[in-house]
């Protein structure tokens, strides 16, 4: 890369072009074709699950997960407020449910202490589930996002979900490649430990199919239902009979070809992400009060994919938006972290708890360039520009 340094872009090469050409020359370019099934099998093997259901986006994957899990109108779902809004809408408003927003801890992931506090002190546990004392609604599920590829505290969150009779939905849309390497969950990949998990192949993710996603579940019937819903709920394909409302959430054969090529390169992408993260951290941590926010590492029993890098400005005296503008002037694309979802136009009346850290990180984070084809020289240019702010 030279000149403009983008935030996060696809890394395609000859392999992706060759694989996609196979689909094009065969004529199987749409949602039918053998490569979709082949990609599903490869994904399932990579994350260590018996089955993966391909979809056309991470958002649709989460919608399928919510429906397969039985979340319905009138339910409530505990969700993080510091995340992309597509992590919340499909689990709540798409299916008629309402969110309960919870802030983050220093991993940027949902705070287990705050989740526990809400369940213990704002709800009543009954034989058939957990009920919100304020609204009387059943709190049916807990949505967990592995933010920027950093593993959430799954042992704690799984325990909370079990004790309070909550379905646990993992949003691993940013965390493909992240897994536990030690401890009680050793070998488990992000997205595979809850009741159902979802992933994304958007263009800015660690690997991409242009757009796409997939669903895995520890309940075989949930995965089967997700597949059924994604294909317009066809009960009889020949006679065009449908047994419920379904959706066109299918992945195309061309996308699956891109995915197969990218999956073969994924471990190399993870290595590059770690190398550039280490380069940023060694050069910028502590300079002028700046910090590169940490990921859980091997010493914590986790192999992180280091998807997005966060420069933390609080102790530097620098203004977030000024930093973004000055770097943009030098041809370096950065961005702020997401606006909190409980402050978005559609959610001002929903309950929200333990927001202080999320508000702080919203104000002081700048995400730095992190493409898997970001070179050491590109990274040095970003570092020099940051040091000269």
Which role does the model predict for each range below?
Residues 1-68, 72, 140, 144, ...:
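Conserved PLP-binding active-site segment in aminotransferase class I/II-type PLP enzymes
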Residues 37-41, 49-52, 113, 125-137, ...:
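PLP-dependent aminotransferase class I/II
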Residues 55, 102, 368:
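Hydrophobic residues at beta-strand termini and immediately following loops
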Residues 61-66, 87, 91, 213, ...:
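Buried hydrophobic packing segments
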Residues 67, 71-147, 151-163, 167-172, ...:
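PLP-dependent aminotransferase-like
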Residues 192-230, 253:
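Active-site PLP attachment segment
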